Amino acid sequence: MSGPLEGADGGGDPRPGEPFCPGGVPSPGAPQHRPCPGPSLADDTDANSNGSSGNESNGHESRGASQRSSHSSSSGNGKDSALLETTESSKSTNSQSPSPPSSSIAYSLLSASSEQDNPSTSGCSSEQSARARTQKELMTALRELKLRLPPERRGKGRSGTLATLQYALACVKQVQANQEYYQQWSLEEGEPCAMDMSTYTLEELEHITSEYTLRNQDTFSVAVSFLTGRIVYISEQAGVLLRCKRDVFRGARFSELLAPQDVGVFYGSTTPSRLPTWGTGTSAGSGLKDFTQEKSVFCRIRGGPDRDPGPRYQPFRLTPYVTKIRVSDGAPAQPCCLLIAERIHSGYEAPRIPPDKRIFTTRHTPSCLFQDVDERAAPLLGYLPQDLLGAPVLLFLHPEDRPLMLAIHKKILQLAGQPFDHSPIRFCARNGEYVTMDTSWAGFVHPWSRKVAFVLGRHKVRTAPLNEDVFTPPVPSPAPSLDSDIQELSEQIHRLLLQPVHSSSTTGLCGVGPLMSPGPLHSPGSSSDSNGGDAEGPGPPAPVTFQQICKDVHLVKHQGQQLFIESRAKPPPRPRLLATGTFKAKVLPCQSPNPELEVAPAPDQASLALAPEEPERKESSGCSYQQINCLDSILRYLESCNIPNTTKRKCASSSCTASSASDDDKQRAGPVPVGAKKDTSSAVLSGEGATPRKEPVVGGTLSPLALANKAESVVSVTSQCSFSSTIVHVGDKKPPESDIIMMEDLPGLAPGPAPSPAPSPTVAPDPAPDAYRPVGLTKAVLSLHTQKEEQAFLSRFRDLGRLRGLDTSSVAPSAPGCHHGPIPSGRRHHCRSKAKRSRHHQTPRPETPCYVSHPSPVPSSGPWPPPPATTPFPAVVQPYPLPVFSPRGGPQPLPPAPTSVSPATFPSPLVTPMVALVLPNYLFPSPTSYPYGVSQAPVEGPPTPASHSPSPSLPPPPPSPPHRPDSPLFNSRCSSPLQLNLLQLEESPRTEGGAAAGGPGSSAGPLPPSEESAEPEPRLVEVTESSNQDALSGSSDLLELLLQEDSRSGTGSAASGSLGSGLGSGSGSGSHEGGSTSASITRSSQSSHTSKYFGSIDSSEAEAGAAQARTEPGDQVIKYVLQDPIWLLMANADQHVMMTYQVPSRDAASVLKQDRERLRAMQKQQPRFSEDQRRELGAVHSWVRKGQLPQALDVTACVDCGSSVQDPGHSDDPLFSELDGLGLEPMEEGGGEGGGVGGGGGGVGGGGGDGGEEAQTQIGTKGSSSQDSAMEEEEQGGSSSSPALPAEENGTS
């Protein structure tokens, strides 16, 4: 219809006296869009009426009207169509033209008459009679169309003819749309006949469905073919309900019976593949049960006899099924959609919905658009769900109640989504009257963005409308429009809900993390079951959950270590550990709850909180599906972020690896009475806080959640978090898991401070699956799938534990030497600052004081000789000599230990391989067996390089090179293993610089002559070789290659700074660098038992012992002995356990060759400039012509300590000419930084003697070293006097 009616008359009206040729005139604009003079033709002047009856147009206006009608197609001014007006005006008065032009246009364009032939003359009587006949037929058709115009379309001030034509056009479009929908419906599903379903004849189908229709007189059944879209069967009740004969429906398209706006909803809800199959032998009872469970679709179906003035639509609830129907005996069965249609009555008419059942729920977006409407709203409001979806909420509220919505949303924000009741509001029903409803509201706070994602409303009708038939069409009135106040109010609410939610209540954040609102959010806020009681005040603290641990990890990774520490320090001090083991966490406004912070909740608080807590949790109904789904996906994401590492790090305090562990214990737990200060590791690990966990939600002696009791090392959390996504090697995966295995066993340990062997490690893991019973989500809510995932998550650790072959002999509580007793507050600052540094690529910030002495409450004892290699897991990482001495005390004799392995004077720390718990050397010098300030004698075992007077009386801990490579845990800058090659290239120049720092002595101590500092190096090499014969030697051959790569990559981390980095080792200088490093580098590659591939504790080596020995006690910080990483045991594991790249040792030449090949391969991926581009850039930037970095960037000075060591330049160095081609430049962030506070890797004092100077020399000149020379030197332990390393002033000290 639109086709022939659209267009414009290109030629305008014919000039007077000229014959008009309708055949050559293009189609004029659609009649409904014509501007026309005179009033509307709503009174419908008949075609035969003469003059201007009902039409005020004069004769002289006909031509102007014709012109406007032919030249204007877009002005729909609500008047009648120009076609009819010009037709009548031309009949009433003679126009200047012999033939009425507008009549010609009308006849030629709107009628299917035969006058498309050009008329011979304008006054032919036969032609005029034909036109009059066509015009009469046209008016008759229009009159009939107007009878079928729906009442709601007959608005005031609108032309009846225009509205009729517009409605006819809409109907045509709807028919076309129906066909398109149907084609999509049938094509999407492929061949429906392939579905396995029962086949019914029409008689069988009628017999089955009659049980429904007899039970409910407002129900009928209809079957629609999926192949043709036509009705193949309809029950007799359809004619009664729709007030028409049953035969009218046979063969008709079902979509043509639906209201146009419901056709898409119907097709979208009846996709064949998603429909339930109509079961064989479905009885009325069973079928009705299925019917109530199936997803229904609401549609309006046209009814009423043809003679009615317009179609009347009645609302029905359609429940679709899929089945096969055989129309006749010989015809094949065809798949059909069987619909059970139930008419919907107004809830206020008989049969009425009881007043206490007039409840429905809604959900709307922060911008106040309906997102979901409960189907129970249909009989109460008169709207079908699809009528409200996407519509503004405020549009349906009484104008006086709209401002209340702003207050409602403010309260939602204040209560963090908690359900609450609100005063009644008036909602406009479909019939135009208002329904008064009691409302309750709740908001869902997105756990990720902490913003209100959507608002849930629960509404109970209090007052019914005066007109109880809510489905009655409203009195014709202008369509509701968005008033300016509605728009403004919606914007205010939207801006309000853009704010993140802050709540001090654990249960305040509806759905954030595991702590979710106890209110029933799928039916929120009823006055009886979810009033604001819980929301108003902070709820009781919730038990620690695994999900909270995940959130802690996320917090640390993304918000920084300092914020993490501060959030942990906020809870009030708790006097002692509770035997109940209930550790509650309170959600801070922006921080996640930290279980381990509140290791010792006060008994009164815990007991008071626990009593009401459990009943509430049991009573609380689960949150909505959207909440659970959102949470589960987030938790799965967090679990994928290497959760084993994070969980492992919760055990920091037990590992005696870093003083920060116990520091943070003190810092977080607050002042702990001395009486309660049994060895923290003993108390925690022995299960004092973990074993007796009786909470029904968390479960008994579940171990991984027991980890929440452990104070963690802040540095460990930070470093591991920052590195967990980059480590890809065996060590970074396995040690965390095995650590957790060990922790699973810990709850079985006997309580008490005294060391006692723990029971077999296989005792505790069994309850572990209960550990992950969701605390916040409640058992009733979490899906079985999630529980299985969590159990599998734990089972991996248990399996690994069996692989490790743990036995009880190795699991011993921490000895007194672990320094878990009271620790002065001074040390806490180091934990914090150190944690912060290790967070930011572990570049030391010397501005943070690093000299506070921390007295150790533990009496001095002999060092810890490494336990046998067969020791079960906790002792797998051989303990290094523990610095057991008073911080400022004088030398204390240490009992000589034989070179062979001897039982540990101190029991092995339980969680020794906490690889991430490393404290950077610049904060805590590597532990030594000697008290501070006491010179160490070289030992047969790997001696600490700082020893001045050789004495073979010390036990043989594996020697730690003074310049050993930094642990990537603290300085990894690679985001994927593919970037390790690039990282090594960047790091290699830096690794040359700080090895002199490996020079003995921490900077605070007296600097011995350079000869003394260089002397021990050859011995160290020999000692290393001899030490390889001990329990540690099993892995030395295998790891030699890895350590060589360590030495090459020199991922200088503050934690693994070189020996001399003592208190000041920087990220750059931490690598093996230094004058007396030739032997040391060899040691580092041969005897160091840590590797960047395993995320080990580089600073755990005894390398820094000498640094401590030389440092004045006042400038030292006690550093716990760090043990070897767990991969030592892995070296003895089966070959298939190891990664493929752990091949037999390779020589340096092959390694360098492979590196160069990788660089060449990477070179192809570097951007290249054409010569023109180079010239153009060179004209602007001179450094482009030289192929060097700009002067502003080419700086090797220590950023943190302010040293001015500058790069002498490398314009002539072949390495950098090659780098120019690659587009690479060595990372020079660590320039003089290696010294940290003390300067170039020389510890606080700038390195020991010449060692310190050479450290500075190499730091300052690393930029100018040849890459090959640097790599070869690092691989082969090249001497520090490499010609590629010119000397420089020791300016960093």
UniProtKB/Swiss-Prot annotation:
Motif (LXXLL): 1039-1043
Motif Nuclear export signal 2, chain ranges: 489-498
Motif Nuclear export signal 1, chain ranges: 138-147
Extent of Polar residues compositional bias: 116-132, 969-982, 1255-1269
Keyword Hydrolase attributed: no
GO biological process annotation, one example: negative regulation of nuclear receptor-mediated glucocorticoid signaling pathway
Compartments reported by the entry: Nucleus; Cytoplasm
Compositionally biased spans, kind Low complexity: 48-57, 64-115, 513-533, 652-661, 1032-1058, 1074-1091
PTM description: Phosphorylated on serine residues by CSNK1D, CSNK1E and probably also by CSNK1G2. Phosphorylation by CSNK1D or CSNK1E promotes nuclear location of PER proteins as well as ubiquitination and subsequent degradation. May be dephosphorylated by PP1. Ubiquitinated; requires phosphorylation by CSNK1E and interaction with BTRC and FBXW11. Deubiquitinated by USP2.
Biased composition (Gly residues): 1059-1073, 1232-1250
Biased composition (Pro residues): 750-768, 856-870, 952-962
Domain of life: Eukaryota
Record PTM Phosphoserine, positions in chain: 122, 126, 660, 662, 703, 814, 975-976
Short motif (Nuclear export signal 3): ranges: 978-985
Main location: nucleus
Biased composition (Basic residues): 826-843
Motif (Nuclear localization signal): 823-839
Segments of this protein annotated with the region Interaction with BTRC: 1-151
Region (CRY binding domain): 1145-1293
Tissue specificity note: Expressed in pancreas. In the CNS, highly expressed in the SCN, internal granular layer of granular cells of the olfactory bulb, tuberculum olfactorium, piriform cortex, gyrus dentatus of the hippocampus, cerebellum, pars tuberalis/median eminence, and pituitary, and moderately in the tenia tecta, caudate putamen, accumbens nucleus, spinal cord, superior and inferior colliculus and pineal gland.
Modification type Phosphothreonine: residues: 121
Assembly: Homodimer. Component of the circadian core oscillator, which includes the CRY proteins, CLOCK or NPAS2, BMAL1 or BMAL2, CSNK1D and/or CSNK1E, TIMELESS, and the PER proteins. Interacts directly with TIMELESS, PER2, PER3, CRY1 and CRY2. Interacts with BMAL1 and CLOCK. Interacts with GPRASP1. Interacts (phosphorylated) with BTRC and FBXW11; the interactions trigger proteasomal degradation. Interacts with NONO and WDR5. Interacts with SFPQ. Interacts with USP2. Interacts with HNF4A.
Protein name as annotated: Period circadian protein homolog 1
